Amino acid sequence: MENKGFELVSTYKPTGDQPRAIQELIEGLEQNKKSQVLLGVTGSGKTFTIANVIKAANRPVLLLSHNKTLASQLYSELKDFFPNNRVEYFVSYFDYYRPEAYMPNTDTYIDKTTKSNWDLEEMRMSTLNSISTKRDTIVVASVASIYGALKPKEYWSAFYNISIAQKISRKEFLLDLVQRGYKRNNVASEPGSFNAKGDFVDIIPAWTKGFHIRVEFFGDEIEKISTIDSNNKITIEKFKEYLIFPASAYTAPTGTIEAAVLRIREELHQRLEYFEKEGKLLEKQRLEDRTRNDLESLEEFGFCPGIENYSRHVDGRAEGEQPFTLFDYLPNDALLIIDESHMMIPQLNGMYNGDRARKLNLVNYGFRLPSALDNRPLQFHEFEKYEFQKIYISATPSDYEINQAHGEIVKQIIRPTGLLDPLIEIRREQNQVEDMFDEIQKQKAKKQRTLILATTKKVSEELTRYFQEKKEKVAYIHSDYTTFERNEILRKLRKGVYDTVIGINLLREGIDLPEVSLIMVLDANKESFFRSKKSLIQIVGRAARNVNGRVIFYANNISKSMEETIYDNLDKRKIQMDYNKKHNIIPKTIIKPITEAIEDKKLNESLISFMSHSKTKKSIKEKEALVKDLRNQMLDASKQLNFERAAELRDIILELEAN
């Protein structure tokens, strides 16, 4: 396996708590600590710290993020830090996914509906290839990493190494390509295809659009191997030998499929006998028809729709045996980094139960064989069995992560900008509405923005109405808003179109509002998920991008969560102030450009108009034109590695198509 080492490229130097955090984490790895926790406040440069640890550790890395938006941001940042190494992106390749399900109470069967994104599938394949062949690889992945994948040995067995002067006929070579999932296509250059003309064979990889592979023959011998630029057809590089990867991440040898078909037939026979014995003739007929159709496709094409439901048989696993995942492609000394671990760990823990509950209905009512239950994500105890060294990252790590690290926490409290954690003030609930109104006036005078967090939709709506009647520029964000509408309100807040935004949960990922210097929290003492210590600390952190950051808790008494949050805040502020005083640092508000998700002004106006009149009938052509333009912008954003914008555009497109 190739290993040229990680090369960190940056104009930054570690500052504040970063040097100490980097050193402690590296020492922990060298001491073979199984788990470490990095507690880093918002804006403290945790990604840069981790980049330095990756460089020093010099081993393959899997970094888990709990959603695609944050994963894309991390991927983009790490690509910038490591331009000369492999940085890969592994998330679900579905732009839209509605899983197969059956609801017995209404006798409703819902077939699986998906919309695949080939760019994401290409990146997933690139991930498998890089992690299999290069040690200087970083993979940024979502929860998709714990879902089933082809058995690594099956995938690796399809790797095809060729070299100049290799004795092989052109016909044999083409047959070898077909066995690895490639399809002949002399008309169009589609990923995972090849075209053969004369002595030339051009292979179109499924893992990149940048080039295709040209193999030239002289008789029954390979004469030349080169990569050709896909756009200008110029030769990029010539090779003495070349490793060709399979055409698909699910390419299985012919013998494997044949063996799987035999096992599927045997299971089908047993299940049909069971339904016959139980008198469930409808379920028996349904299962027999569906499965025999799948078997015919498998025998003829080596593939069938929903082949993943037979993955246990394709892999040769026993009933209940753990599925293979991306984790099984990693070497034993890989480093596992879990970002926003307070969110990621519960997500990993919850995937299996939801998946199994849905599939049990499909099995019980004859839509799937029982083996479909083994097409599943990892159970949490299976995830824990992997013995990779782990680093958990969070501003609010949970007890689980802290216990895994035996109570040891690496803290990163100092921000490179010198910004302090916001001041917290407690005010009584009496006359709180009038008090908030007065605070908004002060904020307006300073040209600074405000967030108000309520606990119920009713209170949020009443507050919004009250302030609007007072002629205040106030907006309310609620769960019914689309991604586009929500983001548009936050952009208008930053621009000053609104002075205040009211909501229940404004802590969703990706919110970065430097103009917000005041957050007012209603019912701060009402213990709940949104008023827990972790949530309150996250709320306070949202005002930490502004030098004048403040938070007001409205409460008639102090809850335990409030008390712990305030003590945490005071401790951090003291550390930060002492550091700034010692190093003569003057805190400065973060400057962040306000960008439009939709860069074309006319397109932006059309979309706003379309969304605002979504209840009226719009022409299909108008919507199709909007979607086409948005998709072009999304692809451009992806090419420019602006994955945050690309993900936002993707969500807007899906909402438009569902409208």
Curated annotation (Swiss-Prot):
Record-linked Pfam families: Helicase_C, ResIII, UVR, UvrB, UvrB_inter
Compartments, as annotated in UniProt: Cytoplasm
UniProt protein name: UvrABC system protein B
Record domain Helicase ATP-binding: where: 27-414
An example Gene Ontology CC term for this record: excinuclease repair complex
Keyword vocabulary terms for this entry: ATP-binding, Cytoplasm, DNA damage, DNA excision, DNA repair, Excision nuclease, Nucleotide-binding, SOS response
Motif Beta-hairpin boundaries: 93-116
GO biological process: nucleotide-excision repair; SOS response
Residues given in the record as ATP binding sites: 40-47
Phylogenetic placement of the source organism: Bacteria, Bacillati, Mycoplasmatota, Mycoplasmoidales, Metamycoplasmataceae
Every UVR domain range: 624-659
